[in-house]
């Protein structure tokens, strides 16, 4: 458990150190302190509807509590099947007042995704992403940070993965 927790904490540090463009203009004025939309969701249900809380879920809660980093956004997804012990631990962390974890309702998210045309299995596989959006992971693209360099993708496509700026082969031939 300690080794797994250490690896999770290293992941938290990687997320926190993600290079992001400096916020300028209206973004700086209105939301200079927002995170860059990386979300860790834990809890919820499995695609077949069983409780999704497991040993890693508790390690993630411990990581949230010990690291106290604003990124990644740390979320717990609560369903009717969520163990009371898990919910209590998440509430203990939340009451410390540093803004995490966020709490989401599994059933509400699932219904939102079904209403958007997703299958029940895909809807159960989804969760929160971005600010507070709900997405069905694995069945749709979610690029919320705005840091996808589409012109670079186009350039690499045109030149068979070769990057003319660096002189390196970065993509597929």
Task: Please report, for each region that a protein language model flagged, where it lies by residue.
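Conserved catalytic cores of very large enzyme subunits
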Residues: 1-173
